Each structure stands twice: as structure tokens, then as C-alpha cells.
Amino acid sequence: MTTRRDPFAPRPRGARPAARSSLTLPPSARRPLTRRSAMLGAAGLMGLGLAACGSSGDGGGAGGGGESGGGTITLGYIPSWTDGLSTAYLMDNRLTAMGYTVEHEPITEAGVLYAGLAQGDVDMFPSAWPEVTHASYMEEYGDSIEDLVAYYEGAVLNLSVPEYVDITSIDELAGQADRFGGRIVGIEPGAGLTEATQDRVIPGYGLEDFELVTSSTTAMITELESAIDAEEDIVVTLWSPFWAMPVYSMKALEDPEGHFGEPEALHHLGREGFAEDFPDAAEWIAQATLSDEQFGSLEDMVVNQFDEGEEAEAVEAWLEENPDVLPPVEGE
């Protein structure tokens, strides 16, 4: 039996590709970041930004390219959001098999990731929520971003409680703040899920007696696990697909007013010029879609079935078990 690990603990590099400097900016940093302005250290950002990535090719982006089946592709993603972590290593495996060099750029905030993608500091965002959750970022940066494919259909945001909590709908939370300690435990302050909860769900359902506590996905999972161990009432912001929903037997509360929005697709996004610079990659990515069952098995393999630092090995194992899910790579 596999022991569940903490997927958010510091991840040793092991055999993973050399990661570039992680960007740790506040959620207010929603403007495009030029390499020059970040490098000069405006507002105390010297040495922290995507400026460190540089440009290594003629394509004008992070990796450049311009030749079929070659070049360097930089993947930008938020490691604690495991849809992005899982698909980043899946893309790494397949793109490497196609002859590309793949680099990883872990980033802590969605707004900064979209800005970096629009600026060309990263080449690809492997698992984005552009239709609803990150619509505001697409409005700001979408003109400089290429939509490569909608790879998964039916993603949703929610408020969730452990299965032992006897409520089934968000509207049942009204008037019960004391029962939950007056708190909804959230994730990163710059997340689209946080914005939707604060701006639409709380006022829409009359939950002003609750405080939305934001920190990180890591902290939310830690607090959730502690509450479940003690069988305490807790309500958290979650989403699906996400490994924690089945692992912790979470119950997504119904959203009768639809304040979280309609189900949306998850997309692979590229910087402007991605398809021109990496035509083989773009053609393959456009055909690479996953069903709910396929995505769930991939994320479970990466997060729960393998140890930290073994994401590449997890993807190899998943591909061995699912050889016909993705389009073939020429020469394999």
C-alpha cells in the first residue's frame, strides 16, 4: 500500500531538470515584467524576477527556437497547484522525446505567471484556467498569449467540507460562522479562486460573518488535514480536478446561485509566437487531451504514488500504463 506523502514539502531537485530562479512577488504584481525593469530591482525586486531567465534564441521568447523539433522550451507553473505540476512533467517527457530541451520555471502567483508568459519570459503555461478563474488575467495579457489547446473539460471551483459535515450547499453556511470558527480557509491571495470567493460567493450567499483566510495551498491542506484528524468542522476553497478531493473525502458544496461560474476547460497556453517557433511541439500539443479518468490517474501517480523529486519517474510509469492516451511521438 502506498503511503500518502505531503506533495507541498520542499521538493529536492534529484533528477528533475535544472529549475530556474523561482519568482516570489506579491499578488499586486499584475503588470508585465520586463527583464530590464526586474533586473534593475525596481521596488526591491532585484534578483528575484523572471529577468534572470534571459533569452537564449532567435525566437524572442524564453527559449527561442525557430527550427522544427529543436530549441529550448521553458515551462512556467505553480508547483503547489498539482494540475500544473503533473502536466509540466508530462510535457517535459513528451517534448524531450521530440528533441526539445525543457527547462522549468516554478512561480508562486498566477498573475505573475501570466505576465511572464505575455512577456515571453516563459514559453508555456502547461495547465491554465483562462475561461473563468483567470479571465481577468486573460483580459490583461491575452493579446500576447497563444491558446494551444483545451486539454481537459469540466474543471470547477468550489467550497468544500469533509464528508462528515452535515451540509450540502453553500447557502446552508449562512448563519453558521461560529460553527466553523468564522473562517473559510483559502489558498494564495492572488488566485482566481480567492477572487471569486471574496468578490462573488461571500456577498452572494450572505457570508459576511466569515473571514476568508488566505495564505497558500500548502497551508490550507495542512489545516484541512489537522481538522479532519480531529473531526472538526472546516470549510475550505477547493477545485476539481484536484487530488485532495478524493484523498480527504471532501464534499463540494452545491452552488445554486452559480457564483463560482460555469465549469471550464483547462488549457495549455503558450507565449506569442510559440507555434511559429516550435511547430512540432504546437502540432503535438494541439492533439494532447485527457479525460477525467486519465487526468485523475496522472495526478494521482505524480502526487501520491511516487516520492518527492520523482515526478519524472511518475510520468514514465503513467505513460507505461497508458501507452495509447496521447498522440505518438515520431521515432519512438
Name each region found by the language model.
Residues 1-33, 40-51:
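N-terminal secretory signal peptides
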Residues 53-67:
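Bacterial lipoprotein signal-peptidase II cleavage site
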Residues 69-83, 100-105, 181-185, 285:
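Short, well-ordered beta-strand elements
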Residues 73, 83-84, 199-231, 263-265, ...:
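An extracytoplasmic/periplasmic, membrane-proximal ligand-sensing/linker region
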Residues 90-98, 181-211:
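Ligand-binding cleft/hinge of the Venus flytrap
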Residues 116, 122-126, 196-258:
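Ligand-binding pocket segment of bilobal, Venus flytrap-like solute-binding proteins
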Residues 143-190:
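A conserved helix-loop-strand patch within extracytoplasmic ligand-binding domains
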Residues 151-157, 244-292:
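Periplasmic-binding protein-like
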